[in-house]
Amino acid sequence: MTNIRKTHPLLKIVNHSLIDLPAPSNISAWWNFGSLLGLCLMIQILTGLFLAMHYTSDTATAFSSVTHICRDVNYGWLIRYLHANGASMFFICLYMHVGRGIYYGSYTYLETWNIGIVLLFAVMATAFMGYVLPWGQMSFWGATVITNFLSAIPYIGTTLVEWIWGGFSVDKATLTRFFAFHFILPFIIAALVMIHLLFLHETGSNNPSGIPSDSDKIPFHPYYTIKDVLGFLMLILLPLLLLLFSPDFLGDPDNYTPANPLNTPPHIKPEWYFLFAYAILRSIPNKLGGVLALVMSILILAIIPFLHMSKQRSMMFRPISQVLFWILVADLLTLTWIGGQPVEHPFITIGQVASILYFSIILILMPLASLIENKILKW
């Protein structure tokens, strides 16, 4: 008798995706981040659901409802900090996942890569709207500043901003709609993840060497299920250490002050995972130019496949490209640091240099390095 997992219409899909899936035999720990992101999404949806049971999306009670969750709800503090620090882990995994895609040339799977970019934008939108919900000072002013960027769009900008706000300023209508969107978006993300996987399984997974591995496949279960479980344990350990010892380490103290439209915080800044894009935005004095640079800092990922000049797919055997890649990583860390600093000398100049370097590495230096490497190898 054939095993039910191979005949049942529903279990068959699970079987082909997680059990009998032929996987390359040499994929490293960098390939763990896909499953870790799935775990992060599940944790966020579950903790978010329990938070939504106690949260009220009204300007008068939002801040106190979060306080109530932390003080009066059974393990409410744990759920709240799991959700907040879970978002940080989500973005760490996301950036690692994208970085791995760039390093090993996974972007040549165009459909998978493009759905991934849509996913990145969706997660960023969700995180931004979630940050507004506790209705602290940084929530309110973050929402005001970020939504105001849309006013840079010529002709329709101001109308668009007021339409998003639901009034002439960030207020009750804004908070209510942000809560609604913050609740629905993770389910849209889950659907996009299914499409992402569907496209990935059309081509099969890439591997560190970048060479087709059709002749050398192993079943996903037990080899990579065990490997993923090890990743899960490590991923759960990190945020647990963080949230049990210093849960507010990655947060902003200003968000423990209730939102006050009459009092602007000295430094308005987003969560740490948006600081690199925020630094790029601030490095351009013109408002529209800054907003375009902000969008392009992420959208540039869509151009990367068309800038691939190398005859090799992966960077594993390309030392010049490797050096450039790690300079890019260091540059992004520099931008993250600059985004959290006040707008004054020397931070302005460092931010501008780092922003120019970011775009020039991706658009000019990496394709050039690829051509030089081809020449060296006489290809």
UniProtKB/Swiss-Prot annotation:
The organism's place on the tree of life at top rank: Eukaryota
Residues annotated to bind heme b b562: 83, 182
GO biological process, one term: mitochondrial electron transport, ubiquinol to cytochrome c
SUPFAM superfamilies recorded: a domain/subunit of cytochrome bc1 complex (Ubiquinol-cytochrome c reductase), Transmembrane di-heme cytochromes
Binding site for heme b b566: 97, 196
Gene3D superfamilies documented for this protein: Cytochrome Bc1 Complex, Chain C
Bilayer-spanning residue ranges: 33-53, 77-98, 113-133, 178-198, 226-246, 288-308, 320-340, 347-367
Localization, UniProt: Mitochondrion inner membrane
GO CC annotations on file: mitochondrial inner membrane; respiratory chain complex III
Entry keyword annotation includes DNA-binding: no
Residues that, per the record, bind a ubiquinone: 201
Membrane topology label: Multi-pass membrane protein
Molecular-function GO terms, alphabetical: metal ion binding; ubiquinol-cytochrome-c reductase activity
Pfam families linked: Cytochrom_B_C, Cytochrome_B
Annotated cofactor note: Binds 2 heme b groups non-covalently.
Annotated function: Component of the ubiquinol-cytochrome c reductase complex (complex III or cytochrome b-c1 complex) that is part of the mitochondrial respiratory chain. The b-c1 complex mediates electron transfer from ubiquinol to cytochrome c. Contributes to the generation of a proton gradient across the mitochondrial membrane that is then used for ATP synthesis.
Similarity remark: Belongs to the cytochrome b family.
Subunit structure: The cytochrome bc1 complex contains 11 subunits: 3 respiratory subunits (MT-CYB, CYC1 and UQCRFS1), 2 core proteins (UQCRC1 and UQCRC2) and 6 low-molecular weight proteins (UQCRH/QCR6, UQCRB/QCR7, UQCRQ/QCR8, UQCR10/QCR9, UQCR11/QCR10 and a cleavage product of UQCRFS1). This cytochrome bc1 complex then forms a dimer.
More about this protein: Heme 1 (or BL or b562) is low-potential and absorbs at about 562 nm, and heme 2 (or BH or b566) is high-potential and absorbs at about 566 nm.
Protein name: Cytochrome b
Natural source organism: Lepus americanus
